[in-house]
């Protein structure tokens, strides 16, 4: 659709010219943004039933560091924020619960910061959450995330191929349905970088269609798509 006779010709053009905006455009076209709130909800159940009780007991500084890596259009980090709000209730103000959300795609981050979603994105939410955490976005069938949930998420551009140099280590890293694009070697080195950026006792959650090689990963396998740093 961009005036090239074939995909190969397009790739050759990208390699020859190496203009960042061309690459950005390609990434935005290639990376899937099919996502919705509470996607793969068994992860969120585990997060609520197992991970949060553990963190609330052990994090004496009351800082929860959670990273949504490859956050696409924002449903995942906003879902995490809603769960934190539900779980902590009136204690929420006593904790720093800000979620770091990163993506390589500027378009995705723009959509995420804009935080406007349609009815189908919200269909998996528990009863009452829509009225509690969303407002009408002005047009019929469109909703926007409430300011308290929005302000709990920090969006940053980040390429997962780069060294991880954030100030904090993480208690939980969500990197779901992102590594399907990577070959084994790339995946292994990314998982090692994640491991080094995880607090002891912290968790890595990946997509349900993904798995890590139990022999080569430093994380301990807990259950499908759920790993822990011992």
Regions found by a protein language model. Name each.
Residues 188-200:
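A short glycine-rich, Lys/Arg-flanked "PGG" loop and its adjoining helix->strand segment in the class I
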Residues 1-67:
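Conserved AdoMet
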Residues 61-79, 98-100:
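Conserved class I S-adenosyl-L-methionine
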Residues 172, 213-230:
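Core SAM-dependent methyltransferase catalytic element
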């Amino acid at each position: 659709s961009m005036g090239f006779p074939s995909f190969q010709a397009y790739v050759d053009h990208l390699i020859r010219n190496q203009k960042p905006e061309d690459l950005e455009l390609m990434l935005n076209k290639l990376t899937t943004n099919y996502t919705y709130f509470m996607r793969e909800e068994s992860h969120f159940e585990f997060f609520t039933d197992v991970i949060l009780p553990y963190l609330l007991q052990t994090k004496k500084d009351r800082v929860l560091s959670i990273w949504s890596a490859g956050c696409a259009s924002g449903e995942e980090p906003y879902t995490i924020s809603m769960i934190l709000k539900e779980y902590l209730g009136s204690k929420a103000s006593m904790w720093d619960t800000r979620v770091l959300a990163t993506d390589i795609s500027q378009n995705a981050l723009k959509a995420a910061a804009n935080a406007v979603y349609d009815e189908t994105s919200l269909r998996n939410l528990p009863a009452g959450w829509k009225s509690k955490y969303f407002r009408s976005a002005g047009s019929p069938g469109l909703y926007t995330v409430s300011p308290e949930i929005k302000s709990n998420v920090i969006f940053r551009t980040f390429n997962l191929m780069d060294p991880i140099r954030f100030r904090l280590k993480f208690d939980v890293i969500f990197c779901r349905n992102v590594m399907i694009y990577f070959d084994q070697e790339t995946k292994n080195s990314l998982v090692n970088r994640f491991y080094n950026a995880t607090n002891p006792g912290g968790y890595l959650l990946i997509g349900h269609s993904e798995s890590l090689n139990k022999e080569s990963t430093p994380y301990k396998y807990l259950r499908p798509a759920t790993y822990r740093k011992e």
